[in-house]
Design a protein with these regions (language model features):
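Feature captures the catalytic ectodomains and active-site-proximal regions of enzymes
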Residues: 1-504
Length: 504
């Protein structure tokens, strides 16, 4: 017997804003979504700050959004968790940090601190780096090197200079730490096996290869003059004494896993074969658990279990479920949605569609959305699944490029693809829910009305319920899973503190 699925469509980076200037969502021609808003019950959801377990006012992101959606509860995120440990002093007692620094003292080796060098709050925060510098100072370490991965994606594209200047001032204040390398996240934080980029980063970190400039501020300013902003700054070597070598300690202070995995594997996994490099022993600390299978690492803040999230609960109830996305968001509908669990639950199938191999997604704003939609429709029509979780990456990934016209095309592509999936779901007698994990494409310009805005936003996101005539209340991302269970006639597990959006 064919199943009538409940399909959750996540339009990544599709926020709502009344502003018209720089708003790719409003500028786009979206006949499908316009029709769905007109015909079906809809509301708005909060997707940032305290409503998703982040600090007040902090913009949401894909990892946090999917964790909250899948968990059916507000999941306390790594950023405030680590920050709280600094405030209560337990940060400085952390066994992993202490092991890394004590090994440096015992071996006379260097400590390397690297991560995304910004206050974007998506992958990292400089407050955590500065706490590590303070700890190194207290312990009396002398050789401490910072490798600055510039952002320009979750922060303004030319903000990196000021972040590095701030860090240099902090080093002078503490009397410890030097900037050894500077490079854009494009090189050091790839997540799609673009090994040529990662190799450039590795060669700078280990072999001192790249642009040579002892002044990191000058190097960044020169890059800006050449039209190359933070995200894409080519690897610069500022201090050849600060290269990573045998028996050194490394602390990667990013707390978000997805863009920390590849470069970490290059350093710690003897079986790594993305490019040729020598393997040497390090004391390597991951700030959080980047991958449960990662060898030769210490984890400063192990994962907190999200028990009885939607995926686990549906599996226990004997339900079948599908997760489908292209490469850029595949980890989000699987690993993050399942609360950091790598392996699928019984009854959970996964479909990965390859993201296009382009330098930046403004060059192909359609990305792989049409193939994702086609494969999803095929599986809806199979009648196999009770629940389908789908992500369209376009609005977020193209929004990050800051190219307005491309973002408009991305929104229009998603609109068309949403229509295909909703139509297939309703034909099977199912229910479709349409939402987003955070905003992005609805704000493509900064407050000056001119400069590109490449970061996420704190705007609310939509929630549309197709196929079930009802009234909806306003809510937050944690309320989606309870709503799914509600329309399926299933009791909510006690661990979920989210509440159904349906007004009874």
């Amino acid at each position: 017997m064919n199943k009538a699925p409940t399909t959750l469509i996540i339009m990544d980076g599709f926020g709502l804003s009344n502003d018209t200037v720089g708003n790719a969502v409003r500028a786009a021609n979206t006949p499908v979504l316009d029709g769905l808003f007109s015909e079906y019950a809809h509301t708005t959801l909060k997707a940032s700050g305290l409503d998703v377990g982040l600090p007040d006012g902090q913009m949401g992101n894909s990892e946090v959004g999917h964790t909250n959606i899948g968990g059916g509860r507000v999941v306390f995120q790594d950023l405030p968790r680590i920050t709280r440990s600094i405030e209560d002093g337990t940060f400085f007692e952390n066994p992993a940090y202490n092991k890394a620094m004590d090994d440096c003292l015992a071996k006379g080796s260097a400590l390397h601190l690297y991560g995304l060098h910004s206050d974007g709050g998506v992958h990292s925060t400089l407050d955590h780096l500065y706490a590590l510098l303070k700890m190194a100072h207290i312990k009396g370490l002398k050789r401490v090197y910072i490798h600055a991965f510039l952002d320009g994606r979750d922060t303004p594209p030319t903000s990196g200079r000021d972040f590095v200047a701030k860090t240099m001032e902090k080093c002078r204040e503490l009397g410890v730490g030097k900037i050894a390398t500077v490079m854009g996240r494009y090189y050091a934080m790839d997540r799609d096996k673009r090994w040529d980029r990662l190799e450039n980063a590795y060669d700078a970190l280990v072999y001192g290869e790249g642009v040579q400039d002892p002044d990191p501020i000058h190097a960044i300013e020169e890059s800006y003059k050449n039209g190359v902003t933070d995200e894409f700054v080519e690897p610069v070597v500022c201090d050849k004494d600060g290269m990573i070598s045998d028996n050194d300690s490394v602390i990667f202070f990013n707390y978000r896993p997805d863009r920390a995995r590849e470069i970490t594997r290059a350093f710690v996994d003897p079986a790594f074969d993305g490019f040729k490099r020598e393997f040497f022993p390090l004391t390597y600390v991951c700030n959080t658990e980047y991958d449960a299978t990662m060898p030769n690492v210490l984890v400063a803040f192990p994962r907190i279990s999200v028990k009885n999230g939607l995926g686990e609960y549906l599996s226990k109830m004997g339900m079948t479920q599908l997760r489908i996305a292209e490469t850029e968001k595949y980890a989000h509908v699987t690993f993050f949605f399942n609360g950091g669990v790598e392996d699928p639950y019984p009854g959970e199938d996964r479909v990965l569609v390859a993201s296009p191999k382009v330098a930046t997604y403004d060059l192909q704003p359609e990305m792989s959305a049409y193939e994702v939609a086609s494969k999803c429709v095929e599986r809806i029509e199979s009648g196999k699944y009770d629940v389908i979780i789908l992500n369209f990456a376009n609005c977020d990934m193209v929004g990050h490029t800051g190219v307005f016209d491309a973002a408009v095309k991305a929104v229009e592509t998603v609109d068309e693809c949403v229509g295909q999936v909703v139509e297939a779901t309703l034909k099977m007698g199912g229910i479709a829910m349409i939402t987003a994990d955070h905003g992005n494409a609805e704000q493509m310009l900064q407050s000056d009305g001119k400069s590109p805005m490449t970061a996420h936003t704190t705007n609310v996101v939509p929630f549309i319920l197709c196929g079930a005539g009802t009234e909806l209340r306003e809510g937050r991302l944690a309320d989606i899973a309870p709503t799914i269970l509600d329309v399926m006639g299933l009791e909510k597990p006690t661990e979920m503190d989210g509440k159904t959006l349906i007004v009874r």
